[in-house]
Amino acid sequence: MATPAQLGLQNATSPIMEELIAFHDHALMIIFLISSLVLYIISLMLTTKLTHTSTMNAQEIEMIWTILPAIILIMIALPSLRILYMTDEFNKPYLTLKAIGHQWYWSYEYSDYEDLAFDSYITPTYFLEPGEFRLLEVDNRTTLPMEADIRMLITSQDVLHSWAVPSLGVKTDAIPGRLNQAMLASMRPGLFYGQCSEICGSNHSFMPIVLEFIYFQDFEVWASYLYIVSL
């Protein structure tokens, strides 16, 4: 999760987020080099009085400033297209989780388990336990198995929402009447926080998302327990 005075992105816990951070650093370095070159040229123009008033054209320079930007754009586009392909790749997901946005809470349905569904509301401040985070805790955490491909189906019951968990590299719009899908996976156990990222009304800021990734055997025990309780 984000921390005060944090510089940079959140720590990655999924392969997609690791690729996004690497691409961010790659693109940022290219932008830094271009900006440095432009500032250097501007400083030269401001500090020298030498001009070439007799120069009418310069074919070599024109070729350089046409070909070089094209090469730079290709260097940025190829990694970006690779990541776009990875985000849309769905290979035999272990389970399917459906997230439904409401004003102002989330509902979750485990499609592979019978009658396994619940609502997830924000925990009021006066109910928080020591060590919990204000505006980020929920009454029912979404529990998932780690090291497993999970397909998310995301929609909305009323207005536009957006289901986002930064450390997993997932941000998908929840649109009424439409199912959007995303793939997520965590390489380690733990709690991961997110929020609705689409302004959806007066309580938009009170729609947190909490994912708890646990080991496979613990997840099966958890799912069995919820099924027994719901009987």
Curated annotation (Swiss-Prot):
Keywords per UniProt: Copper, Electron transport, Magnesium, Membrane, Metal-binding, Mitochondrion, Mitochondrion inner membrane, Respiratory chain, Translocase, Transmembrane, Transmembrane helix, Transport
UniProt GO BP: ATP synthesis coupled electron transport
Mitochondrial matrix side stretches: 46-59
Topology with respect to the bilayer: Multi-pass membrane protein
Reaction equations catalysed: 4 Fe(II)-[cytochrome c] + O2 + 8 H(+)(in) = 4 Fe(III)-[cytochrome c] + 2 H2O + 4 H(+)(out)
Annotated PROSITE patterns: COX2, COX2_CUA, COX2_TM
KW Ribonucleoprotein (keyword) present: no
Stretches of the chain found on the membrane's Mitochondrial intermembrane side: 1-14, 88-231
Cofactor comment text: Binds a dinuclear copper A center per subunit.
Pfam families recorded: COX2 (PF00116), COX2_TM (PF02790)
Quaternary structure annotation from Swiss-Prot or TrEMBL: Component of the cytochrome c oxidase (complex IV, CIV), a multisubunit enzyme composed of 14 subunits. The complex is composed of a catalytic core of 3 subunits MT-CO1, MT-CO2 and MT-CO3, encoded in the mitochondrial DNA, and 11 supernumerary subunits COX4I, COX5A, COX5B, COX6A, COX6B, COX6C, COX7A, COX7B, COX7C, COX8 and NDUFA4, which are encoded in the nuclear genome.
Family listed: Belongs to the cytochrome c oxidase subunit 2 family.
Task of the protein: Component of the cytochrome c oxidase, the last enzyme in the mitochondrial electron transport chain which drives oxidative phosphorylation. The respiratory chain contains 3 multisubunit complexes succinate dehydrogenase (complex II, CII), ubiquinol-cytochrome c oxidoreductase (cytochrome b-c1 complex, complex III, CIII) and cytochrome c oxidase (complex IV, CIV), that cooperate to transfer electrons derived from NADH and succinate to molecular oxygen, creating an electrochemical gradient over the inner membrane that drives transmembrane transport and the ATP synthase.
Stated name of the protein: Cytochrome c oxidase subunit 2
Organism of provenance: Aotus nigriceps
Lineage of the organism: Eukaryota, Metazoa, Chordata, Craniata, Vertebrata
